[in-house]
């Protein structure tokens, strides 16, 4: 049995960026050493056309997997703390991604650095932005600098 791959847990903004650029199916190929997933909570935030593009990648290409968020009571409690109006009041998608990665030692894929940076630093969570993915795609000759603009 193979080693379990670290997951990149994609937030809506990264999915949006790559889908609108016509490159969503490229995303998992940029870092094939990782498993790419999207949480059910994040899917609910996506516009219908982006969701259709994502569903194609999930169902036909099978390079991004969908997972249900909230496997443990600790995850649920932390998620509600982050999204509560009396707490940091962060978005549902990025909160779910960060909590999932905190509890599973995975990587957040989000460009919403304003909302994720402090939490990720506090809990030692690695995160990658759209620009990071584009950088690696260029470095690995999957796209040109001109295509990344």
What are these model-predicted stretches?
Residues 2-100, 104-106, 117:
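Active-site-proximal, substrate-binding regions of enzyme catalytic domains
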Residues 110-111:
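Short beta-strand scaffold positions
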Residues 116-149:
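Acidic, PIN/NYN-like endoribonuclease modules and their adjacent C-terminal/linker elements
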